[in-house]
Regions:
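Exposed low-complexity, polar/acidic, P/S/T/G-rich flexible segments that act as propeptides
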Residues: 57-79, 219-265
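Catalytic cores of extracellular degradative/oxidative enzymes
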Residues: 255-257, 264-353
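Long, contiguous interaction/targeting segments characteristic
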Residues: 71-91, 323, 347-353
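Beta-strand-enriched, solvent-exposed domains that form extended recognition/catalytic surfaces
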Residues: 78-243
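Aromatic, loop-rich ligand-recognition surfaces of beta-strand-rich domains
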Residues: 1-21, 30-79
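A mature extracytoplasmic/lumenal domain signature
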Residues: 40-42, 53, 170, 219, ...
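Non-cytosolic beta-sandwich-type ligand-binding/adhesion modules
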Residues: 2-30, 174-196
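Residues that flank catalytic or metal-binding motifs in active/ligand-binding sites
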Residues: 4-7, 32, 43-45, 60-66, ...
C-alpha cells in the first residue's frame, strides 16, 4: 500500500533540461490507475512529477509501476449518427434500416441492426453503474480494515489477450476504470487484479489476464451528489451474469442466472455482502437456495455493524463486505476482502450449515 500519489505537480521539458509547469493533479491516494488529460498535444523529451503528498502504510514513499502516453484517435466512429449517447446503448428516434446500412463501421452497424430488430442481448452488456465512496474513508474513521472495492460487478468475463470494447456514456467528469480479477490462483489468493482506465466514448482494451470484470467508480467523499450513474456498454467480452438480491429484475431468477453462468466464478450480491465463489460449488452446495444464502451473509454483516453501534449513530459502512474463494491457508480477513479456502465451500455455500 506504499507509494500512492496525492497532490502532484507535472512538468515537461522540450529540450530535456529546462522544465515548465504543465498542470497540478491530485490523484487522491488511489490504489487504482490514474489519468491525466492534456488540453493540447505536448511535444516533450521528458516529463517530471513532483509528488507533494501521498498515502500508504509507510508514508513518505512515491512509487509508479508504469506510466504510458497516448494520443486520441482522430479517425473514430461518430456515435451521434445512430445512437443517443456515447454508450451506443440506444438508437436515436427515427433511425431506419437505411440509415444503418449507410454506416461505414461494421462493428457499430451490427449493433444498430440488432437493436432496431429488438434482438440485441442488452442484459449485463448495458448497465448503469452508481458511484461508491472509497472504502478507505470509513476505514480511517472506524479504525477497521477497509471494506470492498468491487461493489460494481458487470457480469462480463474476459480472456487473456482479448480486445474488449467498452462504450462509456457521460462520466460527469469522474475517473472511471475497470478491474479484471482472476481468482484462479493455485495455492494462492487471486484477489486483486489488473485495472484499466476508461474514457468517455469508445475504449478498446487489450486484456492481459483472464477474469471477471468490475467497474471502479469511486468518490473521495461519502456523499457526492454530482457523481451520477454512468451508463456503460460492454460490446464484447462474454456474458457470465451475476445475482443481486436487491435488484428487482433478479427476483426469482437465482437458478436461471446461476445455470447460465459460463465462467468458473460467479458473483452474488446482497445489501451488505458480496460473494465470489466457484460456480460449481454454488450449484452443488447452494442449489436453489441462493436467496437464503445471501440473506444469511447480509444478516451476519448487518449484525456485526449493529453490534458496533454503527446503525444507532448512522455510521453504517457504505461498501459491502467482500468474500472470495482462495486456495491457500484456511480463512482470513484483511484489507478489502475476507477469504475462504475452497475446502470450506461445502459449509460456506450451504444455507443450512
Amino acid at each position: 500500500n506504499n507509494g500512492r500519489f496525492k497532490e502532484t505537480e507535472i512538468q515537461y521539458s522540450a529540450d530535456g533540461h529546462t522544465f515548465t509547469k504543465l498542470i497540478d493533479k491530485d490523484f487522491q491516494g488511489s490504489a487504482t490507475a490514474g489519468k491525466v488529460t492534456f488540453d493540447q498535444t505536448i511535444q516533450a523529451k521528458s516529463f517530471r512529477f513532483i509528488v507533494k503528498s501521498g498515502s500508504g502504510d509507510g508514508q513518505g514513499f512515491a512509487s509508479c509501476a508504469e506510466m504510458e502516453f497516448f494520443a486520441k484517435n482522430p479517425v473514430n466512429f461518430d456515435y451521434s449518427t445512430l445512437f443517443t449517447d456515447a454508450s451506443c446503448s440506444e438508437l436515436k428516434t427515427g433511425i431506419t434500416e437505411d440509415d444503418i446500412a449507410q454506416c461505414e463501421y461494421p462493428f457499430f452497424k451490427n449493433i444498430a441492426y440488432y437493436m432496431i430488430k429488438g434482438k440485441y442481448p442488452a442484459e449485463f452488456r448495458i448497465s448503469e453503474f452508481k458511484a461508491y465512496p472509497n472504502p478507505d474513508i470509513q476505514s480511517e474513521t472506524h479504525k477497521t480494515n477497509p471494506y470492498s472495492q468491487l461493489d460494481n460487478p458487470t457480469g462480463i468475463s474476459v480472456k487473456a489477450g482479448e480486445n474488449l470494447i467498452v462504450l462509456v456514456g457521460d462520466t460527469h467528469g469522474y475517473d472511471i476504470g475497470l478491474r479484471v480479477q482472476n481468482l484462479d490462483a493455485p495455492e494462492n489468493d487471486g484477489f486483486g487484479g489488473v485495472t484499466y482506465l476508461l474514457n468517455q466514448g469508445i475504449n478498446k482494451l487489450t486484456i492481459s489476464e483472464q477474469g471477471l470484470v468490475y467497474v471502479m467508480y469511486v468518490t473521495k467523499t461519502l456523499d457526492d451528489p454530482a457523481a451520477a450513474p454512468v451508463k456503460i456498454h460492454f460490446a464484447s467480452g462474454k456474458v457470465n451474469g451475476y445475482f443481486d438480491s436487491q435488484n428487482p429484475e433478479h427476483n426469482g431468477r437465482w437458478s436461471e442466472l446461476l445455470n447460465k453462468a459460463t465462467n468458473r466464478y460467479f458473483d452474488v450480491l446482497g445489501k451488505y455482502a458480496h460473494l465470489t465463489f466457484e460456480t460449481s460449488d454454488l450449484r452443488t452446495y447452494t442449489g436453489s437456495k441462493g436467496d437464503e444464502l445471501i440473506d444469511l451473509y447480509d444478516k451476519i454483516v448487518y449484525s456485526e455493524q449493529q453490534l458496533l453501534g454503527l446503525e444507532k449513530y448512522d455510521k453504517m459502512f457504505r461498501n459491502r463486505m467482500y468474500l472470495n474463494v482462495m486456495y491457500k491457508s484456511y480463512m482470513y480477513a484483511t484489507a478489502y476482502h475476507t477469504a475462504y479456502n475452497r475446502t470450506t465451500m461445502n459449509e460456506i455455500c450451504s444455507p443450512e450449515k
